[in-house]
């Protein structure tokens, strides 16, 4: 992917390790919109510098200027700048109020919020391969891990509407050796929405003559007071699915989550994570710059397939991408340190399971069948990475419990 640099001198007080950051964006994205895009991005970075150094009056002035020249309905650079500017504005207001605006991740979602997010994710699934890749790759790994098993228990740490599981039901139902039972334990924020998801999955399983049970748990795994709520049974193969995102907190207490997984000793954990490596407890500017680069690629990818007038595009950008940007920029910070999950899973007794071979081949075939160009698939050290013009967006990996020596 050809990129173009935008250089800004960033204050060393915020990030002592680097007095200057070089920010690179897809050259075609910038060239299509010319000097206007470069000016917008430069203004946004200047505003981020002001916020990082608590020059809030200057930041507010610059945000007013930015709001006059960019729109969430314009070009891809305009749109991404508009959402990052909104997030900076939220952070500025929070700073004026002495932190009165608490992180969204600490607030349970209302039913209405959940429904809006789930609906927007369904739309995203119809206009982009990212969610399809997540579901398909994890399902292939799970199917392989369940070879020879006839009693299955899947623990989905964020089941949402359960969109992933009908495809797995299909391939499990096609096996010569029929399942004696398949259970899904699904975590979620609303008992009503969980019940609705359970009914849909039960109806689908029934249509395939699969013996199915759904076990809803309202809440998040890291806050589980009694791990026996997971209700594992003797002789069943246990799989944990963990799709990470930044729409809301999925796991709660990181250390408790790891301890529960360690004690659970599942046959397999499938993890799909965004390729954002910043540390929430570190530099604000570091978090801002990496997020700006990452989400610029996502906006560019959507813009490549959908026009500026597309209602689907606006829905995804506003409810999915805009919410994640706000959580990273306006609410992210030192309250909670992001784990490096690869290292942490290894530390508590898990080893990676390679996704090369059939999962990689099947993922490549899926990507080739979809109508979107510009996406790339790379197998690296047994993981699968989906990218946009060579910038990694999602990484899928699988893990297996192993005893300590």
From Swiss-Prot:
Residues 31-400 form the GRAS domain. It is found in: Nucleus. A motif (LxCxE motif) lies at residues 45-49. The keyword Transcription applies. Residues 330-400 are annotated as: SAW. One of its GO terms (biological process) is leaf development. Residues 196-228 are annotated as: Leucine repeat II (LRII). Residues 121-186 are annotated as: VHIID. GO terms for cellular component: nucleus. GO terms for molecular function: DNA-binding transcription factor activity; transcription cis-regulatory region binding. A motif (VHIID) lies at residues 152-156. Residues 1-20 are annotated as: Disordered. InterPro entries: TF_GRAS (IPR005202). Residues 38-102 are annotated as: Leucine repeat I (LRI). Keywords: Nucleus, Transcription, Transcription regulation. Expressed in seedlings, cotyledons, shoot apex, leaves and flowers. Residues 238-327 are annotated as: PFYRE. The keyword Transcription applies. Interacts with SHR. Probable transcription factor involved in plant development. Belongs to the GRAS family. This is Scarecrow-like protein 23. The gene is SCL23.
């Amino acid at each position: 992917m050809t990129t173009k640099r935008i250089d800004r001198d960033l204050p060393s007080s915020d990030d002592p390790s680097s007095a200057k950051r070089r920010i690179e964006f897809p050259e075609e994205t910038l060239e299509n919109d010319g000097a206007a895009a470069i000016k917008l991005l430069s203004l946004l970075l200047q505003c981020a510098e002001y916020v990082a150094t608590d020059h809030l009056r200057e930041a507010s002035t610059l945000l007013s200027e930015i709001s006059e020249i960019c729109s969430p309905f314009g070009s891809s650079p305009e749109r991404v700048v508009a959402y990052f500017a909104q997030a900076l504005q939220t952070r500025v207001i929070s700073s004026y109020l002495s932190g009165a605006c608490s992180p969204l991740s600490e607030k349970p979602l209302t039913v209405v919020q959940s429904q809006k997010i789930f609906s927007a994710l369904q739309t995203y699934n119809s206009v982009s391969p990212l969610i399809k890749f997540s579901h398909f790759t994890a399902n292939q790994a799970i199917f392989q891990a369940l070879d020879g098993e006839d009693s299955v228990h899947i623990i989905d740490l964020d089941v949402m509407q359960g969109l992933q599981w009908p495809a797995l039901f299909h391939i499990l139902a096609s096996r010569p050796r029929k399942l004696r039972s398949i259970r899904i334990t699904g975590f979620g924020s609303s008992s009503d929405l969980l019940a609705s998801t359970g009914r849909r999955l039960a109806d689908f399983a029934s249509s395939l003559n699969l013996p199915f049970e759904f076990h809803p748990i309202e809440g998040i795994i890291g806050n589980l007071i009694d791990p026996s709520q997971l209700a594992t049974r003797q002789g069943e193969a246990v799989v944990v699915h963990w799709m990470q995102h930044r729409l809301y907190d999925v796991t709660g207490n990181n250390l408790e989550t790891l301890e529960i997984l360690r004690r659970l000793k599942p046959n397999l954990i499938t993890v799909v994570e965004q390729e954002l490596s910043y540390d929430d407890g570190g530099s604000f500017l570091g978090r801002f710059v990496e997020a700006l680069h990452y989400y610029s690629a996502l906006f560019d990818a959507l813009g490549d397939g959908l026009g500026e007038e597309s209602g689907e595009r606006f829905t995804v950008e506003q409810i999915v991408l805009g919410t994640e940007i706000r959580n990273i920029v306006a609410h992210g910070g030192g309250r909670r340190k992001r784990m490096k999950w690869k290292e942490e899973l290894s530390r508590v007794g898990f080893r990676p399971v390679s996704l090369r071979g059939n999962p990689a081949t099947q993922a490549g075939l899926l990507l080739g069948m979809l109508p979107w160009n510009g996406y790339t698939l790379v197998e690296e050290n047994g993981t699968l990475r989906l990218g946009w013009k060579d910038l990694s967006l999602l990484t899928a990996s699988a893990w297996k419990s192993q005893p300590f020596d």
